[in-house]
């Protein structure tokens, strides 16, 4: 639905910190499904952990936040979409983060986020991350869209 080229028009993140490759579902102001292909070539695996590579939980949470940012931007009204290049999403809080299953090179990490609450420029999202339908991580995220 939204490829990495389009994602880069929405988010300011770039390699090695752009953590979503594609959006496969998006219902504005409701939910998003996006994924990242985790590869052994990721710079993070040089130190986490040599000989036993595990994708860090903090990177999973950041990927969720980036997917949430795409959802928030794509949920903006048409008149606000025109000024998207002058906006940025700031992470406000993470609550209830839990890491349930390790993510390894070769995994397709799928982010599923649902809007719990939205008021003005503030978004509260329930995020879950899966590999092959196995829950790997979950958290409640709060973010806001602001001018750059």
UniProtKB/Swiss-Prot annotation:
This is 3-hydroxyacyl-[acyl-carrier-protein] dehydratase FabZ. The active site is at residue 48. It is an enzyme of class 4 (lyase). It comes from Campylobacter concisus (strain 13826). The keyword Membrane does not apply. Belongs to the thioester dehydratase family. FabZ subfamily. PANTHER family: 3-HYDROXYACYL-[ACYL-CARRIER-PROTEIN] DEHYDRATASE. Keywords: Cytoplasm, Lipid A biosynthesis, Lipid biosynthesis, Lipid metabolism, Lyase. Gene3D superfamilies: Hotdog Thioesterase (3.10.129.10). Coiled coil: none annotated. It catalyses: a (3R)-hydroxyacyl-[ACP] = a (2E)-enoyl-[ACP] + H2O. Its EC number is 4.2.1.59. The gene is fabZ. It is found in: Cytoplasm. GO terms for biological process: fatty acid biosynthetic process; lipid A biosynthetic process. Involved in unsaturated fatty acids biosynthesis. Catalyzes the dehydration of short chain beta-hydroxyacyl-ACPs and long chain saturated and unsaturated beta-hydroxyacyl-ACPs. GO terms for cellular component: cytoplasm; membrane. GO terms for molecular function: (3R)-hydroxyacyl-[acyl-carrier-protein] dehydratase activity. It comes from the Bacteria.
